[in-house]
């Protein structure tokens, strides 16, 4: 697997030439894949033009290898309905040539994305009861449909699909980061348990599809996240499930135009997408995919309906959801408690799956429905931030 490193000062603006595609920069200190780039084509690029461009890229692969750039060339190809592009390892001369192609919209460094979990401790769950009661309570109130016929794509660190919480409803989908079809951090299994676990889950009858994009350190390249989204869309389309699917990404990193564009493609295709706002107590506008306006960006609330101290905020946030001391599944059996906006986002994904099954709404309309049902109960949500808390519409 390609190694990661942290750059102290990085700007590619100097590579740009007149009439060339923009080569975006990343903030100081951002962790990136060495010589890794994401290339996005212009919207009007035809399939034939894209194929011709890829043939040209293949022709210069040999030259890069001769210049001593190990593992050079295209690693992932993206072919969304309204976005075409690819990622790979390229030297500066090659990136300059790529940016000069009039079919290229922009190029950006392949930054590292991380999961949004902050602490683990043992405490009782409370999130399920809170999202089904306007004023709080001890019981989780829900319709027995419970997400039946809905698929939940967990784009994360993997899922222990054999965990008893999933009752055989979890399957392995794709691995875009390593060769280990397991959950090395427990993060993805916890997230999946909140969405669809029999005990800790909201949509207790939904199917879970594991899409691994984060390694055992909870990190992965942006290019792999985009590939995971691309795979999920294709898989849901193949099975006729686009409008009956939710996609959760409890992860994030520095702003990425490519990742935001790719995330938007899932909504355009018909899916519901929930993402975590981030855990730095800052405006989430600078993070991706949280800053993508078409997704459902979720901040974390506490047991007393306050903003969790770590939670990001800002106008990109669509809703608050329980994200502090959340009990859910652990790989190998059993359970564990975690906190973070990573725990808040799957609450939204679970309620979206629940409503898709119960009300028959298409996935890409579910975020609007969540906001319609939500309650304005969060105290001190942050500047220019909604105070609305997730609610499943149970009537309680």
UniProtKB/Swiss-Prot annotation:
Domain Peptidase S8 span(s) in chain numbering: 125-396
Entry function: Secreted subtilisin-like serine protease with keratinolytic activity that contributes to pathogenicity.
Signal peptide positions on this chain: 1-20
Organism field: Arthroderma benhamiae (strain ATCC MYA-4681 / CBS 112371)
Name of encoding gene: SUB5
Lineage: Eukaryota, Fungi, Dikarya, Ascomycota, Pezizomycotina
Active-site residues from the entry: 156 (charge relay system), 187 (charge relay system), 342 (charge relay system)
Assigned GO CC terms: extracellular region
Family: Belongs to the peptidase S8 family.
PANTHER family from the UniProt entry: ALKALINE PROTEASE 1-RELATED (PTHR43806:SF58), PEPTIDASE S8 (PTHR43806)
Protein name: Subtilisin-like protease 5
Protein EC: 3.4.21.-
Domain of life: Eukaryota
Region of interest (Disordered), residue spans: 376-396
Glycosylation sites: 230, 248, 392
One Pfam family cited in the UniProt record for this chain: Peptidase_S8
Swiss-Prot/TrEMBL keywords: Glycoprotein, Hydrolase, Protease, Secreted, Serine protease, Signal, Virulence, Zymogen
Proregion residues excised on maturation: 21-116
Any one biological process term the GO annotation gives: proteolysis
Compartments (UniProt record): Secreted
């Amino acid at each position: 697997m390609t190694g990661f490193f942290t750059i102290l000062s990085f700007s590619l603006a100097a590579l740009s030439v007149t009439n060339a595609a923009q080569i975006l920069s990343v903030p100081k200190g951002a962790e990136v894949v060495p010589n890794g780039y994401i290339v996005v084509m212009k919207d009007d690029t035809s399939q034939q033009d894209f194929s011709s461009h890829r043939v040209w890229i293949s022709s210069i692969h040999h030259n890069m290898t001769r210049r001593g750039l190990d593992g050079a060339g295209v690693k992932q190809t993206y072919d969304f309905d309204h976005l075409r592009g690819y990622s790979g390892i390229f030297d500066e001369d090659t990136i300059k040539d790529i940016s000069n192609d009039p079919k290229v919209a922009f190029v950006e460094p392949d930054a590292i994305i991380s999961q949004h979990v902050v602490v683990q401790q043992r405490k009782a769950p409370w999130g399920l009861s809170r999202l089904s009661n306007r004023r709080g309570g001890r019981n989780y109130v829900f319709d027995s449909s419970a997400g039946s016929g809905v698929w939940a794509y967990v784009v994360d660190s993997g899922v222990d699909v054999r965990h008893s919480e999933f009752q055989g409803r979890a399957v392995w989908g794709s691995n875009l980061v390593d060769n280990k079809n397991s959950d090395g951090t427990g993060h993805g299994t916890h997230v999946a348990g909140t969405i669809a676990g029999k005990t800790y889950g909201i949509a207790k009858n939904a199917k879970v599809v594991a899409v691994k994009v984060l390694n055992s350190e909870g990190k992965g390249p942006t290019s792999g996240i985009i590939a995971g989204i691309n795979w999920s869309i294709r898989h849901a389309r193949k099975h006729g499930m686009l409008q009956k699917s939710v996609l959760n990404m409890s992860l994030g990193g520095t702003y990425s135009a490519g990742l935001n564009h790719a995330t938007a493609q899932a909504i355009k295709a018909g899916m519901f997408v929930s993402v975590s706002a981030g855990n730095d107590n800052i405006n989430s506008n600078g993070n991706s995919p949280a800053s993508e306006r078409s997704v459902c960006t979720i901040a974390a609330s506490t047991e007393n309906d306050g903003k969790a101290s770590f939670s990001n905020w800002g106008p990109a946030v669509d809703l608050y959801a329980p994200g502090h001391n959340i009990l859910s599944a652990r790989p190998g059996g059993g359970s564990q408690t975690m906190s973070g906006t990573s725990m808040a986002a799957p609450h939204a994904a679970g309620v979206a799956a629940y409503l898709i099954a119960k009300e028959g709404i298409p996935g890409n309309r579910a975020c609007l429905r969540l906001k319609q049902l939500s309650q304005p109960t969060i105290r001190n949500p942050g500047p220019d931030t909604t105070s609305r808390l997730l609610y499943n519409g149970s009537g309680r």
